[in-house]
Regions:
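Catalytic-site microenvironment of enzymes
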Residues: 1-318
Length: 318
C-alpha cells in the first residue's frame, strides 16, 4: 500500500495557491488593485520549459514565506510501513525460581561436606534479586519442605498454581559414588572428585512444551558459555552408566533428562540448571564466591530477557 507524504513548498514558490489564502475584501471598501504581474521564482527541483506565473498582489508579496502542504502519493519501502516489533513487559512475565532439594533432604554433599541445598538456596536468591531488579517483579522463589519425592510433587503443583510462564530449577552437581576419592578436611575424611566440572542444562522431551523449554535452555547455556564457563561433558559419556543423558547440543551443553519430575510434569516451559560441580574442590570454592553467583545470575537474567522478548513477539501480551 502506498503511504501519503506531505512535502513542504515555500509560499513564494506557489503563486497558484495565493488566492486560497487571501482574505476577502471588507464590505464597503473596494478591493485593492493588484500590482503589475511579477514573474515568480521557479524552484530548482522543478523543471519547466515555459513557466506561467499568475499575478500576485502587493500585500501577498510582503508576507514571509510559510510552509504549505502539497498532496501527492509517495511510495515508501516496506520497512517504513512495518510496525515496530513488540517487546516483553517484564512485570507481566511470571518466573518460578526453584531451590533444588530441601533442608531435610539436602542433595549432594560438597567436597567440604556442605549440603547442596545451601548452595542452591544462595544462588537462587541472587537470581531472584537480579530478576526483580530488572523489572521481573512477578518472580517467585520456590522453597519446599520434606523428603525428596514428595517435595518434587509439591514443586510442580506450586508452579501450576502460580500460573508461571517459566520454571527454572537451580542445582549444583556431583558425581556417581564410583568416582569419589578421599581427602582430609577439617580433621575428617571427605569425598571429592576433581575429574569433572562445569555447568549443564537439562530439559525433558516429555514436557508438554518441550520446544519452548529447549529454546530457553539454549539461551541460558549460551549465556553461560559467553561468560567463559565450560559445560560438563561427562553426561554424554558411557562411563556415566545410568547417569548418562542424551546431549542435545554439543556446543552449549544442553542435555535431556526426560523422566525428571519437575521437568516432565510441569505445565509450562521448564529447565534445570546444574550451576557447577561442588564435589570438585577448586570449583566448589568458585561456586561459594559472590563473584560466581553474580556471573551466573547475570547470565540467567540475560537469557530470560531474550526469551521473554521472543515469546512476547510470537504470542503477544501475556
Amino acid at each position: 500500500m502506498a503511504a501519503m507524504l506531505l512535502l513542504p513548498i515555500e509560499a513564494g514558490h506557489a503563486g497558484w495557491l495565493s488566492d486560497m489564502f487571501k482574505g476577502s475584501p471588507k464590505p464597503g471598501k473596494p478591493a485593492k488593485q493588484a500590482t503589475a504581474p511579477k514573474p515568480a521564482a521557479v524552484p530548482k527541483r522543478i523543471v519547466a520549459a515555459k513557466p506561467v506565473t499568475p499575478a500576485k498582489s502587493a500585500a501577498s508579496s510582503k508576507h514571509r514565506p510559510v510552509k504549505l502542504a502539497a498532496l501527492g502519493p509517495v511510495a515508501l519501502p516496506p520497512s517504513a510501513l512495518k510496525p515496530a516489533a513488540p517487546t516483553c513487559d517484564p512485570a507481566k512475565f511470571r518466573i518460578v525460581v526453584d531451590v533444588g532439594h530441601t533442608a531435610e533432604s539436602g542433595g549432594a554433599k560438597s567436597a567440604r561436606n556442605v549440603d547442596e541445598f545451601l548452595y542452591n538456596h544462595r544462588l537462587a536468591r541472587r537470581i531472584e534479586q537480579k530478576l526483580k531488579a530488572d523489572g521481573f517483579t512477578e518472580t517467585r522463589l520456590l522453597l519446599t519442605e520434606g523428603k525428596a519425592r514428595r517435595s518434587l510433587v509439591r514443586r510442580v503443583a506450586a508452579a501450576s498454581e502460580l500460573q508461571a510462564n517459566l520454571f527454572l530449577s537451580i542445582h549444583h552437581d556431583s558425581v556417581p559414588t564410583k568416582f569419589l576419592e578421599e581427602w582430609e578436611f577439617e580433621g575428617k575424611k571427605r569425598g571429592f572428585s576433581d575429574r569433572f566440572g562445569g555447568y549443564s542444562v537439562f530439559v525433558s522431551r516429555k514436557n508438554p512444551d518441550f520446544r519452548t523449554s529447549l529454546a530457553f535452555a539454549e539461551l541460558l547455556a549460551k549465556e553461560m558459555k559467553a561468560f567463559g564457563l565450560p559445560y560438563a561433558e561427562q553426561y554424554s559419556q558411557p562411563v556415566m552408566g545410568r547417569h548418562r543423558h542424551p546431549l542435545l547440543n554439543k556446543e552449549t551443553g544442553v542435555y535431556s533428562y526426560d523422566e525428571l519430575v519437575v521437568l516432565r510434569k510441569t505445565r509450562m516451559p521448564a529447565v534445570l540448571l546444574e550451576a557447577g560441580s561442588i564435589i570438585n574442590r577448586d570449583e566448589e570454592l568458585e561456586m561459594a564466591s559472590p563473584e560466581r553467583r553474580n556471573i551466573i545470575s547475570s547470565g540467567v537474567v540475560a537469557a530470560v530477557k531474550q526469551f521473554c522478548d521472543r515469546r512476547w513477539a510470537i504470542l503477544g501480551p501475556l
